[in-house]
Amino acid sequence: MKPGIHPTYAEITATCTCGNIIKVNSTAGKSLHLDVCGACHPFYTGTQKVVDTGGRIDKFNKRFGILGKK
């Protein structure tokens, strides 16, 4: 590796709105503020909401459901 051309790594803190603090190495050199992290993201915590698309599915089946039946 050539000396003097690589960026320096510094340990920074990434702080989430839930209060979770993550320490990472970065070349940016400043702390980060995160909106969501793995500790509070709805997918990982199991609190995700199911979007009601029943009307769309019924409309699709009414329109194209006959084509799939044999």
Swiss-Prot record:
Its cofactor is Zn(2+). The keyword Methyltransferase does not apply. Zn(2+) binds at C16, C18, C37, C40. GO terms for biological process: translation. Binds 1 zinc ion per subunit. SUPFAM superfamilies: L28p-like (SSF143800). GO terms for cellular component: ribonucleoprotein complex; ribosome. One of its GO terms (molecular function) is metal ion binding. The keyword RNA-binding applies. Keywords: Metal-binding, Ribonucleoprotein, Ribosomal protein, RNA-binding, rRNA-binding, Zinc. Part of the 50S ribosomal subunit. Binds the 23S rRNA. PANTHER family: 50S RIBOSOMAL PROTEIN L31, CHLOROPLASTIC (PTHR33280), LARGE RIBOSOMAL SUBUNIT PROTEIN BL31A (PTHR33280:SF6). HAMAP family: Ribosomal_bL31_1. Belongs to the bacterial ribosomal protein bL31 family. Type A subfamily. This is Large ribosomal subunit protein bL31. It comes from Shewanella denitrificans (strain OS217 / ATCC BAA-1090 / DSM 15013). The lineage of its organism: Bacteria, Pseudomonadati, Pseudomonadota, Gammaproteobacteria, Alteromonadales. The gene is rpmE.
